[in-house]
Amino acid sequence: MARVTVEDCVEKVPNRFELVMMAAQRARDIAAGSPLSVDRDNDKNPVVALREIADETVTLETLRNSLIKGHQRVPEQDEPEEEIVELMAGENAWSVPEAGGDEGGDASELLDDEGEGAAAGAEPDFSEMDVPLADLADEDKI
């Protein structure tokens, strides 16, 4: 940035922090398509914004208002109560089924790897294993 431009701007806006905020807002406005009031001369948007402030081709009050408007937060509006009532009505569909009902399922309906039903509490059959359990215990040094 040209030092002369910044020094000229400090005369117009004595607070350097406010100057930076106003120049940044004007640079954003330029990037958004706002028309330029000075020639670009192959300068970037922040430099053009500072030149506009130094030449007083933009009003400082307009920049302040634009800056304030850009930083204000609009509170979110609450959802209408009708939607809440519908959501609460939908909670009934998620209710837990009765203990004796058919919907709950049973542990005896679970299938093992071969697709056979596993009885609840039944011991697994290890006779089909290739390595005896005693050999596995020796390997792990248990």
Curated annotation (Swiss-Prot):
Compositionally biased region (Acidic residues): 100-116
Catalysis: reaction(s): RNA(n) + a ribonucleoside 5'-triphosphate = RNA(n+1) + diphosphate
One GO-annotated biological process of the protein: DNA-templated transcription
Alphabetic keyword roster: DNA-directed RNA polymerase, Nucleotidyltransferase, Transcription, Transferase
Cellular component GO terms held in the UniProt record: DNA-directed RNA polymerase complex
The keyword rRNA processing is assigned to this record: no
Enzyme superclass (EC): transferase
EC code(s) of this entry: 2.7.7.6
SUPFAM superfamilies for this protein: RPB6/omega subunit-like
UniProt region (Disordered), positions on chain: 93-142
InterPro entries assigned: DNA-dir_RNA_pol_omega, Pol_omega/Rpo6/RPB6, RPB6/omega-like_sf
GO molecular function: DNA binding; DNA-directed RNA polymerase activity
Pfam families: RNA_pol_Rpb6
PANTHER family registered for this protein in UniProt: DNA-DIRECTED RNA POLYMERASE SUBUNIT OMEGA (PTHR34476:SF1)
Quaternary structure annotation from Swiss-Prot or TrEMBL: The RNAP catalytic core consists of 2 alpha, 1 beta, 1 beta' and 1 omega subunit. When a sigma factor is associated with the core the holoenzyme is formed, which can initiate transcription.
Function text: Promotes RNA polymerase assembly. Latches the N- and C-terminal regions of the beta' subunit thereby facilitating its interaction with the beta and alpha subunits.
Family recorded in the similarity comment: Belongs to the RNA polymerase subunit omega family.
Name listed for the protein in its UniProt record: DNA-directed RNA polymerase subunit omega
Species, as recorded: Rhodospirillum centenum (strain ATCC 51521 / SW)
Gene coding for it: rpoZ
